[in-house]
């Protein structure tokens, strides 16, 4: 992983992670009309309605379920068990954290990805230890930030930075993984997972801005904020927009249900607007109309496709195969994006959104996220190429294995049919 990723991390927050090997029972299947994509071809109803999760490794490459399961287990051992390559570390107080090996800190990004991985893989003990660490060390329990989580801490649990701050994607993955935990394990153990999720959902929408801290979502645009304070409240990070998760919040939240019902389509519009009309590339940060945006005096050019932006393909692909409500737009977006990378011979990592000024080397995280984006492709040859690249990619090692590794890990779960809506 390039050194520049590590430097960029100082100014933003990222991560990706989640796993699962076993099937899940649903509480029922709902009817859903068949969608059509831009070519007029029917799109299978989303997995939320059918409980059918496709293994693209099997479909495109002929890889057996046994081979797939074995690979997922290897990835779990690599990142959660092996002393030389893991990013999961346990502490003496019955807690655990996901370690950003490049920046040598602990982020809500990684903690929430780790929890999602654990609930998907039925690893309750590890899930509880991660959540215990997050609540003990990251949660603000008083003051204007009360209810939010500090976006990064030292491995010893000390919040970093002079001023409190959160990173919105951490709360988003916390909430969704806690809902899944509630549905998978019940609420009678160490935690009432449902109430934990409901509390965060309520807390992050209880800030009126009078003390300088706002709601996690901008109440006018219905979009998740980059950070719920100052000017950042009026901007977003396209990769924080997870319409598939927000669909579930609208169903499961006890509070603000009418508001949450408006957020999935707002997120879908933002992703469509932020995707460049020729290249499909997304910026790291954007205005609410999708225009690339860079905060004043920021440490790098966030108008480029660089660090956070690679996750957008994963968000789009997940929404496509979970719900399929914006199939035509999502097929077009992923066709533009993945054809652009193919024309670049899958060579570079960073670009201006118009495709100019390429730099870096095509990364493991990009390989993963783009394979998830391939769910939305009509071009089966291109989809197969992206999926083959993911299967063949070596497990990330070294100092910068955390970010690319977590995106890679979640992507493997998605593409293998193991990243599921646990109802």
Regions found by a protein language model. Name each.
Residues 1-11:
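Short, small-residue-biased leader/transition segments that mark boundaries at the very start
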Residues 2, 115-122, 173-184, 244-248, ...:
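Short glycine/serine- and small hydrophobic-enriched flexible loop segments
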Residues 15-23:
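Bacterial N-terminal signal peptides
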Residues 24-33:
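Sec-dependent signal peptide cleavage junction
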Residues 36-74, 81, 104-108, 143-150, ...:
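Extended ligand-binding clefts on enzyme/binding-domain cores
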Residues 72-110, 119-163:
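Internal amphipathic alpha-helical repeat/solenoid segments
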Residues 104-111, 160-185:
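Aromatic-rich carbohydrate-recognition surfaces in CAZymes
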Residues 351, 355-423:
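C-terminal functional modules
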């Amino acid at each position: 992983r390039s050194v520049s990723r590590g430097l960029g991390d100082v100014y933003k927050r990222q991560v990706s992670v989640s796993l699962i090997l076993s099937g899940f029972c649903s509480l029922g299947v709902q009817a859903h009309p068949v969608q059509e994509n831009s070519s007029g071809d029917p799109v299978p109803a989303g997995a939320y309605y059918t409980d059918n999760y496709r293994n693209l490794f099997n479909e495109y490459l002929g890889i057996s379920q046994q081979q797939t399961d074995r690979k997922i287990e290897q990835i779990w051992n690599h990142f959660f068990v092996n002393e030389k390559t893991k990013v999961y570390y346990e502490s003496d107080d019955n807690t655990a954290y996901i370690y950003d090996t490049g920046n040598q800190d602990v982020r809500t990004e990684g903690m929430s990805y780790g929890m999602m991985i654990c609930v998907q893989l039925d690893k309750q003990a590890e899930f509880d230890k991660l959540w215990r660490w997050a609540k003990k060390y990251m949660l603000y329990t008083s003051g204007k930030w009360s209810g939010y989580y500090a976006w990064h801490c030292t491995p010893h649990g000390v919040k970093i930075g002079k001023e409190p701050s959160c990173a919105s994607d951490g709360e988003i993955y916390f909430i969704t993984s806690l809902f899944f935990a509630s549905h998978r394990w019940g609420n009678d153990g160490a935690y009432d997972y449902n109430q934990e999720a409901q509390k965060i959902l309520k807390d992050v929408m209880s800030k009126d801005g009078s003390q300088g801290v706002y709601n996690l979502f901008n109440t006018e645009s219905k979009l998740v904020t980059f950070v719920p304070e100052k000017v950042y409240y009026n901007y977003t990070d396209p990769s924080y927009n997870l319409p598939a998760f927000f669909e579930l919040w609208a169903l499961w939240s006890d509070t603000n249900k009418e508001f949450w019902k408006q957020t999935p389509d707002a997120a879908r519009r933002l992703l469509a607007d932020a995707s460049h009309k020729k290249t499909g590339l997304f910026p790291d940060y954007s205005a609410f109309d999708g225009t690339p945006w860079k905060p004043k005096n920021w440490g790098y050019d966030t108008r480029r496709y660089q660090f956070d932006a690679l996750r957008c393909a994963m968000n789009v692909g997940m929404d496509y195969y979970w719900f399929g409500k914006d199939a035509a737009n999502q097929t077009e977006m992923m066709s533009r994006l993945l054809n652009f990378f193919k024309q670049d011979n899958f060579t570079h990592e960073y670009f201006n959104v118009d495709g100019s000024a390429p730099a870096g080397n095509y990364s493991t995280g990009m390989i993963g996220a783009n394979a998830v984006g391939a769910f939305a492709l009509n071009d089966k040859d291109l989809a197969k190429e992206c999926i083959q690249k993911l299967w063949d990619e070596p497990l990330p090692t070294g100092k910068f294995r955390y970010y690319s590794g977590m995106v890679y890990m979640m992507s493997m779960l998605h593409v293998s049919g193991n990243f599921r809506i646990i109802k």
